[in-house]
């Protein structure tokens, strides 16, 4: 179960990629703006300021996140992102740190590009850190007993969870889009006790937590602490450096054809 309060513990750090993503969208006006994977809605509110005349549509698969978004005045809907269909007036589709949970997300992006109106925008950001220690140590510990029997049905994300910027760009260019894609690594300077553990508790560990009772969960967390400290050693000043690679794809639907016409 997703916990909005835990997720928001690092709101500033998690928010920066969202703002970086939205800043590259070229739509000056929009009729409808959709936030797919809106989470607790703290960032969705910014979309209403960026496009004040637009209808803001928000979706998330977590009822807890949707409830938190509604408390912020967001008209959010609980639903599977795979079933979302754009309305005819949709001019901007944004998904920040959500589509990596959907194995077929690249196909979804292409489908959207084929039905959205020309001149609309698709902006997606996904994590690209699934081979880093913050994921690897969780998988390694979960393979040990007594945990293995509890989490054996979890499809831990490993390998090609997300594509490369070039692969996404190629698919969307083939669909007629003009594409901007990049993959920076953010160096988060975290503070507090066991900050990397607390970070992944709000995201990557959510499906693991659902399999454990309270005692097993606390035991698992305690065993993770030294493993994460080895991978991300705290500095003497109390900060912990946490590198985090992310992939960004911003596509203007029909933009490739328009660019060719201009040239």
UniProtKB/Swiss-Prot annotation:
GO biological process terms held by the UniProt record: methylation
Compartments where located: Cytoplasm
One Pfam family linked to the record: Methyltransf_25
Transmembrane domains' residue ranges: none
Keywords: Cytoplasm, Methyltransferase, S-adenosyl-L-methionine, Transferase
A GO-annotated cellular component: cytoplasm
Broadest EC class assigned to this enzyme: transferase
InterPro entries: Methyltransf_25 (IPR041698), SAM-dependent_MTases_sf (IPR029063), Trans-aconitate_MeTrfase (IPR023506), Trans_acon_MeTrfase_C (IPR023149)
Catalytic function, reaction form: trans-aconitate + S-adenosyl-L-methionine = (E)-3-(methoxycarbonyl)pent-2-enedioate + S-adenosyl-L-homocysteine
EC code(s) of this entry: 2.1.1.144
Molecular function (Gene Ontology), one example: trans-aconitate 2-methyltransferase activity
Domain of life: Bacteria
Keyword Methyltransferase on entry: yes
Family as reported in the entry's similarity comment: Belongs to the methyltransferase superfamily. Tam family.
Function: Catalyzes the S-adenosylmethionine monomethyl esterification of trans-aconitate.
Protein name in UniProt: Trans-aconitate 2-methyltransferase
Taxonomic lineage: Bacteria, Bacillati, Actinomycetota, Actinomycetes, Mycobacteriales
Encoding gene per record: tam
């Amino acid at each position: 179960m997703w916990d909005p309060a835990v997720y928001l513990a690092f709101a500033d750090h998690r928010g920066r990629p969202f703002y970086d993503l939205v800043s590259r969208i070229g739509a000056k006006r929009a009729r409808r703006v959709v936030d797919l994977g809106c989470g607790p809605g703290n960032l969705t509110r910014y979309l209403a300021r960026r496009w004040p005349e637009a209808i803001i549509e928000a979706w998330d698969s977590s009822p807890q996140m949707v409830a938190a978004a509604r408390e912020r005045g967001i008209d959010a809907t609980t639903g599977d992102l795979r079933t979302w269909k754009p309305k005819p007036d949709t001019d901007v589709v944004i998904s920040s740190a959500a589509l990596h949970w959907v194995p077929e997300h690249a196909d979804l992006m292409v489908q959207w590009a084929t039905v959205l109106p020309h001149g609309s925008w698709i902006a997606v950001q996904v994590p690209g850190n699934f081979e880093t220690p913050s994921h690897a140590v969780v998988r390694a510990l979960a393979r040990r007993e007594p945990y293995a029997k509890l989490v054996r049905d979890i499809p831990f994300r490993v390998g090609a969870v997300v594509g490369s910027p070039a692969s996404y760009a190629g698919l969307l260019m083939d669909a007629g889009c003009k594409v901007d894609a990049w993959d920076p690594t953010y160096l988060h300077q975290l503070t507090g006790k066991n900050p990397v553990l607390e970070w992944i508790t709000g995201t990557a560990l959510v499906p693991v937590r659902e399999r454990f009772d309270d005692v097993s969960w606390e035991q698992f967390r305690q065993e993770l602490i030294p493993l994460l400290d080895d991978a991300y050693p705290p500095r003497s000043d109390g900060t912990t450096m946490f590198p985090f690679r992310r992939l960004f794809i911003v596509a203007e639907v029909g933009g490739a054809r328009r660019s060719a016409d201009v040239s």
